[in-house]
Amino acid sequence: MIQIYDEFFPRELQEEILNKLMEPHWHLRGGNDHNLFWHYDHLDQQEYFNEFLYKKICAKLDIKFSGISRIYANGQTACQGGTPHQDNDADMTFLYYPSLHWQPVMGGHLMFLDNDGFEDRIVQHKANRSVLFPGKLWHYASAPSRFYVGLRISLAYKLWL
């Protein structure tokens, strides 16, 4: 079951998260060899993300997870699309979009696929939105529009139930 939460964090916290994610720790190594995108690894080693923010996420979702598999961020610039994949390293995937402003025409939406590989559901990328879904679902992020000049960020938590 895919769950969507809008206006997930208060504006002040949203800005704080975005500022932390804009620190210069990005590497062009996400995705695969044929389809690279920006990646910010090892956020699970930062107390801000693995303690402070994790507790806020659990409280907001009203779920007690048994643990964290990984925390990282993906970043996409114009025309950088994701590759369809499953998150088999945890039961649930929590994504958070810390963007302060986003318009649907900018693209970068979260695409879920059916068993035949066709798009089954689209969750629009939206500022301060979060999405919780079973990691076994096939999904990918579509590319931001060629007119988008920023970094589309998704903060990812891989969680055990």
Q: What do these predicted ranges mean?
A:
Residues 1-69, 76:
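Non-heme Fe(II)/2-oxoglutarate
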Residues 51, 55-161:
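Catalytic core of non-heme Fe(II) oxygenases with the double-stranded beta-helix
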